[in-house]
């Protein structure tokens, strides 16, 4: 199976695709697994199962599935694009770039491939090339707030702060609730927000449909803006709210770390190490 036909998806795969689109992973997973029991060589189903694995953070499983799909169908560009994304998510930017270069060789005008390549280059210090790619993407698709924000990150990194601010502002104009763009502005130490900015952030923070990450970044940005104005109590109320959200996300429990440190202090005494002096050397000699 060297290629993948897009027009002949069987009903079980169409149902699984709809479930994936709607975020109903509990429906998509059994459909895909049952289908693959009947036809374990269908690269389309394997790619869809890989996408499901990636959505729940099982990136290694997703990678293995995608490599299998590409063994079966080397020209399956959707699977290769998914593989590049999974590698990028695992901080394996050089490997992601290799896949993206292959994709762009056959689909040179694909803005999604160019956008991901720009992000991967940014992780490797290829800032100028990344900027060029972002400019190409934005010329073709100018209404993408997160791309404008990523472009702003690259501009800021190379010292083009004024251009970076313009890019962040463009992102915010397209999506006023984009918390990371507001925080990126706040994180510029010379930035001072106007009354209109604070009003816009406050309105965005009150949005009922606000994503958790947007909320916490808006809290941090509002905290910085209000602190700069001397409104300390209001500022730290926002800092506290943002940190509470972040702590809930990470599941960090300081008492667990404290207990481990206390146990280590109790166990790892000078006498403990003296009793075991030379153990590593003896093991190396007898190994």
Which role fits each region the language model picked out?
Residues 1-287:
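Alpha-helical solenoid repeat scaffolds of the TPR/TPR-like class and their adjacent stem/linker regions
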């Amino acid at each position: 199976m060297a290629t993948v036909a897009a027009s002949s998806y069987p009903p079980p795969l169409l149902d699984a695709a709809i479930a994936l689109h709607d975020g109903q992973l509990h429906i998509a997973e059994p459909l895909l697994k049952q289908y693959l029991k009947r036809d374990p060589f269908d690269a389309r189903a394997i790619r869809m199962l890989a996408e499901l694995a990636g959505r729940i953070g099982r990136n290694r499983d997703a990678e293995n599935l995608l490599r299998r799909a590409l063994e079966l169908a080397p020209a399956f560009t959707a699977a290769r694009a998914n593989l590049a994304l999974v590698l990028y998510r695992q901080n394996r930017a050089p490997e992601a770039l290799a896949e993206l270069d292959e994709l762009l060789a056959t689909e040179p005008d694909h803005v999604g491939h160019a956008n991901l390549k720009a992000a991967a280059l940014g992780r490797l210090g290829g800032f100028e090339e990344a900027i060029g790619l972002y400019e190409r993407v934005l010329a073709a698709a100018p209404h993408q707030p997160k791309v404008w924000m990523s472009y702003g990150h690259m501009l800021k990194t190379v010292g083009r702060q004024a251009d970076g601010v313009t890019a962040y502002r463009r992102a915010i104009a397209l999506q006023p609730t984009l918390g990371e763009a507001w925080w990126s502005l706040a994180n510029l130490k010379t930035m001072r927000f106007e009354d209109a900015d604070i009003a816009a952030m406050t309105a965005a923070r009150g949005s009922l449909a606000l994503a958790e990450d947007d909320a916490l970044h808006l809290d941090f940005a509002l905290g910085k803006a209000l602190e700069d104005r001397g409104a300390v109590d209001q500022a730290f109320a926002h800092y506290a709210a943002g940190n509470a959200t972040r702590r809930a996300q990470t599941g960090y429990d300081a008492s667990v770390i404290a207990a481990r440190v206390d146990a280590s202090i109790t166990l790892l005494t000078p006498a403990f190490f003296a009793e075991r002096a030379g153990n590593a050397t003896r093991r190396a000699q007898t190994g």
